[in-house]
Amino acid sequence: MYLIPTVIEQTNRGERAYDIYSRLLKDRIVFLGSPIDDQVANSIVSQLLFLAAEDPDKDISLYINSPGGSITAGLAIYDTMQFIKPDVSTICIGMAASMGAFLLAAGAKGKRFALPNSEIMIHQPLGGAQGQATEIEIAAKRILFLRDKLNRILSENTGQPIEVIERDTDRDNFMTAQKAMEYGIIDRVLTRADEK
């Protein structure tokens, strides 16, 4: 069983205990450290909305260490990042793959970072279908539609031509932090927290 660490703070009113994620939220840090599904997306979206309502002019930092996951759940996070007023800075620690890389690139321009040993991976959507031929055809059309949508957005966020994105996402495409910076997924490789 995984235990969530607790942080104890001293205040003028005494001691206060927080789970680590609540304590990070006080500093406007949201942590995405798992595969992306609807439950994870709802948690991330609610944290972003809360922080935007609390102070619409102060940046939010989204730390990403995720292998990716559900496209629709990831797009819910993406749309919220674009919808709220505060800039969302993205920082890759460990791995940002698939939808994780998509969200990394979706951070505010100039505020997308990765740590030196991070790994970033982009690829086309994965999916499967079963059932009658008509159902399989519907599923195939949908995944092609989603692939085109994700490629277009990734092209806008990286500055890469759509043809390059289509070619580079055809198979799993792993990048170092440096390569991701050259590609336009991030703006800078960080070695220390005070460089942000």
From Swiss-Prot:
SUPFAM superfamilies: ClpP/crotonase (SSF52096). Fourteen ClpP subunits assemble into 2 heptameric rings which stack back to back to give a disk-like structure with a central cavity, resembling the structure of eukaryotic proteasomes. Signal peptide: none annotated. It catalyses: Hydrolysis of proteins to small peptides in the presence of ATP and magnesium. alpha-casein is the usual test substrate. In the absence of ATP, only oligopeptides shorter than five residues are hydrolyzed (such as succinyl-Leu-Tyr-|-NHMec, and Leu-Tyr-Leu-|-Tyr-Trp, in which cleavage of the -Tyr-|-Leu- and -Tyr-|-Trp bonds also occurs). GO terms for molecular function: ATP-dependent peptidase activity; ATPase binding; serine-type endopeptidase activity. Keywords: Cytoplasm, Hydrolase, Protease, Serine protease. GO terms for biological process: protein quality control for misfolded or incompletely synthesized proteins. HAMAP family: ClpP. One of its GO terms (cellular component) is endopeptidase Clp complex. This is ATP-dependent Clp protease proteolytic subunit. Its EC number is 3.4.21.92. Transmembrane segments: none annotated. Coiled coil: none annotated.
